[in-house]
């Protein structure tokens, strides 16, 4: 019964949650319509393959869950994550040339890896990788 009441309270409380951006800002973004969405993160290093075998369940960014990879093994992927061909200027130019008005990029996925430098964790693209890059700042 306690679990049910806790669940109901959580639902009720979440109804009062407010957006992190203003309604005006959201409306402006929504009117842009044509945007680039970039799904990029530590999982990109694996390319949907774990230990030489393709992981066909789920999406590539879900590889840790669907391949049953332990957190420390998955975390070791950061030691070789060095996307030297990532070119923020080229990406922005491509989006502009295509008439896109905004770019949305994954800053932190459910694996917990941050694509930006942060003081809250070392598990990020600057502190945990050989490339020492803040991809969000570059964008």
PLM feature segments, named:
Residues 2-10:
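Sec-dependent signal peptide recognition
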Residues 1-2, 32:
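Generic cytosolic/nucleocytoplasmic N-terminal low-complexity/intrinsically disordered segments
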Residues 9-18:
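Hydrophobic h-region of N-terminal signal peptides that target proteins for export
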Residues 19-139:
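Mature catalytic domains of secreted/periplasmic carbohydrate-active enzymes
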